[in-house]
């Protein structure tokens, strides 16, 4: 049975879904004001592995991942500009155009990294009615109060506040660096609806005046709407957002539900550069697109799953080169097996030893998704297979058996091993979109997609008869 580490209980627990055979999973997605970096990539690959292993285990997953397109302020302490509006002013375009642009960019990254698309990808700007209704319920239950057009959640009304992050309210108040907002009854109270100044671009009418939602209320309202207005199985996200974001989500949602928001809190750890967290604020980040110019998407994915999702990953050229070498080892192994499997049947008997590796693979994955150990099992299988190949002791039937086993477990790893010269499906999709743009004479869009291909390390050439060719640079 799968055991998952639950950040809420701080222990590994047996995973049992609320509804037999089905899993509800909500993952906090990126704030879309720039291209995703490898820290984002690490997290969403980790959640993809979780989803894939649940599906491998026979469960149907209802996967929600939002895109935050309003309400995430530059400072988490509810001061400063909205991150998307700030970028919109720099680029002198509408903030929703900014959001659209970077959602499209994120989708390209996720396709390249072979991350399965979520079943639903809600955006707060399209859920304003549901968010307002959620805030109204909080007010009706006396968990929130309105002051001069803004609405605040009353932390003292929720005695369990701090249970996810392990913080208590007294320490939070004494350690607060935030100037006290006179509108708040308690310094820890946080905004669920924010009064919009005249210059604010994204704003909506509400029972409390013109404003916009706070960052934290968005996830509570959208998960409530899309996961049955009840407790759901798994909430995923980055460990750095445990406080205040996830903590505030719990307070809001459990105030309405009167029971747990989610049974499991599965949080991934950060990526570091020279021991320092990779982040946009420190300008020490590498975008997924820049990394893809140097490395095959499967190399990046293998680099991620070579570490446990709860451990810190150090980003370096050395680490990526090691992943590249390991992918080459896997690729050569698969290629050799395919060559043998394609041969005519021989007289050698089939040796079925994959069940041993299958058991060990599942034991590793059942232990809180221990992908490093699961990969080590595969590397051992590669070594054993190569020994048998070298000694001419591997039959065609055995090769086919091993290939079949690899295909099953690679549905969990999600490593796309391209044949030499083969263009990934995600790159082909962009090529088709560019062709459609050219056919409709949308040349600015065509040029934009050509530039995107270049960013991803591919060149496109227009040929006769309205065809095209894509090549790796």
Residue ranges of predicted features:
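Short glycine/serine- and small hydrophobic-enriched flexible loop segments
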Residues: 52, 224-225, 383
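Alpha-helical recognition segments enriched in aromatics with Gly/Pro capping
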Residues: 1-33, 48, 108, 128-339
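The substrate-binding groove and active-site-proximal loops of carbohydrate-active enzymes
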Residues: 88-94, 119-125, 209, 238
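N-terminal, positively charged nucleic-acid-binding surface of large information/translation enzymes
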Residues: 9, 18-114, 463-465, 469-470
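Short phosphate-binding/catalytic loops that engage adenosine nucleotides
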Residues: 59, 143, 458
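Short, glycine/charge-rich beta-strand/loop segments that flank catalytic centers
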Residues: 64-70, 101-106, 116-131, 149-158
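Structural preference for alpha-helix termini/caps and helix-kink/transition segments
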Residues: 277-279, 283-473
